[in-house]
C-alpha cells in the first residue's frame, strides 16, 4: 500500500530507475495531497510487472490529488483493473504500458500513450476544466468506451495527438460535456477496425474523427 499525504507538493516514486520490478501481490494506492503515486518514470529503461492474478486498487483514503502514472507498466493475466480518482487528480496509462485485463478508469483527467490493451477498456473523464490530449500510439484489441461527463469547463479530450492509435474492437464515444471528444487529433493513419458508435447529449460540441490538417484515419 502506497499512501501519499505530504504537506509539500511531493509524490511517491516507485521503481523510478529500476528495470523489471515485480509485484507479486495487489497494489493499493492513496493520495489526498501532493503529486500522487508514479511508477517507472526516472528513465527510459525503468519498468514494472504486476503478476498474474493481482490488481491495482484505490485505498479507503481515496485518490484526489496528483498523478497516478502507470509508465512502462505491464499488468499480467486477466484480472480487471478498476480505478476511480477524484479532486484534481489524473490517471496516465503508459507510455509503454501493457494491460491484460479489462481496464475501467474514472478520473477528472485521463491520458493514454503507446500502450496495448488486450481486453475491453472504459475511460470516463469527469472534469471539463482542463483539456486532455493523449499522445497516441495505443492499440486497443477489444472494445473501447470513452465517456466525457462534465457540466463545467470547456476543455477538449483527444487521442492520438502525435502518433496514430489502432482500434481493433468497436469504439463507443459518449459525450455529455461542454466541449468535444477528438480521435486522431494530430496523426495520420489511425485505424478503426470495428464499428464507431456516437452518443451526444446536453451542450456538447460533438465528436471529431481527426482534427489537424495532416491527421487522417
Model-derived regions: residue spans:
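Extracellular beta-strand-rich, repetitive "passenger/adhesive" scaffolds
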Residues: 1-139, 143-166, 170-217
Amino acid at each position: 500500500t502506497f499512501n501519499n499525504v505530504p504537506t509539500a507538493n511531493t509524490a511517491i516514486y516507485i521503481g523510478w530507475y529500476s528495470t523489471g520490478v515485480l509485484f507479486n501481490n495487489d497494489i493499493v494506492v492513496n493520495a489526498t495531497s501532493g503529486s500522487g503515486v508514479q511508477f517507472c518514470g526516472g528513465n527510459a529503461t525503468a519498468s514494472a510487472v504486476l503478476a498474474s492474478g493481482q490488481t491495482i486498487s484505490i485505498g479507503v483514503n481515496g485518490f484526489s490529488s496528483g498523478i497516478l502514472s502507470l509508465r512502462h507498466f505491464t499488468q499480467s493475466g486477466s484480472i480487471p483493473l478498476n480505478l476511480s480518482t477524484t479532486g484534481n487528480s489524473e490517471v496516465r496509462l503508459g507510455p509503454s504500458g501493457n494491460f491484460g485485463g479489462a481496464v475501467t478508469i474514472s478520473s477528472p483527467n485521463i491520458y493514454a500513450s503507446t500502450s496495448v490493451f488486450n481486453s475491453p477498456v472504459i475511460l470516463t473523464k469527469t472534469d471539463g476544466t482542463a483539456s486532455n490530449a493523449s499522445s497516441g500510439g495505443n492499440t486497443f484489441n477489444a472494445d473501447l468506451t470513452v465517456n466525457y461527463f462534465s457540466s463545467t469547463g470547456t476543455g477538449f479530450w483527444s487521442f492520438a495527438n502525435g502518433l496514430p492509435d489502432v482500434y481493433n474492437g468497436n469504439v463507443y464515444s459518449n459525450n455529455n460535456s461542454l466541449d468535444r471528444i477528438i480521435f486522431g487529433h494530430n496523426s495520420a493513419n489511425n485505424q478503426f477496425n470495428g464499428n464507431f458508435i456516437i452518443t451526444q447529449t446536453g451542450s456538447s460540441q460533438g465528436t471529431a474523427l481527426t482534427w489537424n490538417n495532416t491527421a487522417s484515419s
